Design a protein with these regions (language model features):
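Hydrophobic core of alpha-helical transmembrane segments in multi-pass integral membrane proteins
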Residues: 17-26, 68-82, 96-108, 118-130, ...
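Transmembrane helix interruption/hinge and helix-loop junction motifs
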Residues: 27-36, 85-89, 129-137, 282-291
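Hydrophobic core segments of alpha-helical transmembrane domains in multi-pass membrane proteins
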Residues: 35-45, 92-101, 137-149, 197-198, ...
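Membrane-interface helix-loop-helix junctions at boundaries between adjacent transmembrane segments
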Residues: 56, 82-169
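Aromatic-rich transmembrane-lumenal/periplasmic boundary elements in polytopic membrane proteins
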Residues: 168-207
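Membrane-interfacial catalytic/cofactor-binding modules of polytopic membrane enzymes
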Residues: 192-246
Length: 325
């Protein structure tokens, strides 16, 4: 077994602030390159280790096999993304929304009859609802990406801080918001930054996220590929995205007391590392191939984390109301 000294909460919090600063500096200098590196190298290891940890925690749900339903929804997302393209731009967002709704059912309801009724009602409600472009953007684009890596990470941190009530924890939660805000208020000096053809081609499948974020923050109009890769508004948003993803991964790896690397069986650790190396090699061979090959795993960790996200917000609400008593 590997030996790791377990860090206390204050040490982890200060390390996290340091990781935020490092991620911030790199995001200012090489935003596209940082994102592509983090997504290809840190991402797969994060998916594998977090899913393993969630499995040990029964995915924070009340049913033993709830993860099967969430996993099946990921299969549908993959199918309608690559095998049989969705017939409308609400099909995949509806699957994601349904996953979030049934995750809430799995967290709060134990009785199987009530669960079944609520899941059916959620399905019918989504099927009958009238949605537009805003729904597609927030559920189909933002929820599994920037909301997952930034908002849910912040909520998970805040939940832990409210339980431990440490000054260093509060500082880390505030630091995350301040640093994210800095990308929109600090005018970076001219770094003669240009996006190479390889980088722009590798990133093209993510471009929709940038376009909608540029529009959401009202940075410029019209918005096209040139806006994303060659303008200051495009760089501002890309810096924020690169920082959010990179720190999301680093935040997870810093939690040695959660992952407990030293307690992971050698066989499990070897399989995890072998799959991780294989994933990274795919990205090196062709970034597009790696992205498509890991698409299911990426979405799987998003769906399986929904119950934890809901639990985090539940804990935050309980803590806030307990302060008022």
């Amino acid at each position: 077994m590997f030996k790791f000294s377990e860090l206390n909460n204050d040490q982890i919090n200060y390390i996290n602030i340091g990781l935020m600063l490092v991620s911030c500096v790199l995001a200012f200098i090489l935003p596209f390159e940082l994102f592509l590196f983090s997504y290809a190298v840190l991402g797969p290891l994060h998916y594998l280790t977090e899913i393993g940890w969630l499995h040990k925690k029964n995915y924070f749900t009340k049913g033993k096999y709830d993860f099967v339903a969430l996993s099946f929804l990921c299969v549908l997302v993959f199918y309608f993304s690559f095998v049989q393209p969705a017939k409308s731009n609400t099909q995949v967002p509806n699957i994601i929304a349904f996953g979030l709704l049934i995750a809430a059912v799995f967290v709060f309801v134990k009785d199987n009859l009530y669960r079944a009724v609520l899941c059916v009602l959620a399905f019918i409600g989504l099927a009958l609802s009238t949605t537009g472009n805003t729904y597609f953007v927030w559920i189909g684009v933002f929820l599994p990406t920037i909301i997952h890596v930034f908002v849910f990470t912040w909520a998970f941190m805040l939940y832990g801080v409210l339980k431990n009530k440490s000054l260093s924890g509060y500082l880390s939660v505030v630091a995350l918001i301040v640093i994210a805000f800095s990308f929109f208020v600090i005018k970076a000096p001219a770094l003669q930054y240009q996006v190479s053809a390889y980088v722009s081609k590798s990133y093209e499948l993510f471009g929709l996220l940038n376009k909608y974020l540029i529009d959401f923050f009202g940075l410029t109009a019209p918005i096209n590929n040139d806006t994303v890769f060659n303008t200051n508004p495009g760089f501002i948003v890309m810096r924020f995205i690169a920082f959010a993803y990179t720190y999301h991964y680093l935040n997870w790896f810093s939690k040695t007391s959660v992952i407990k690397w030293h307690l992971v069986p050698k066989k499990t650790l070897f399989i995890t590392l072998a799959l991780w190396v294989f994933s990274v090699v795919l990205y090196i061979i062709d970034y597009g191939i790696g992205l498509k090959a890991l698409y299911f795993l990426s979405f799987l960790h998003v769906f399986l984390e929904f119950p934890l996200n809901i639990t985090s917000f539940q804990g935050i609400v309980k803590s806030v109301f307990s302060f008022k008593k």
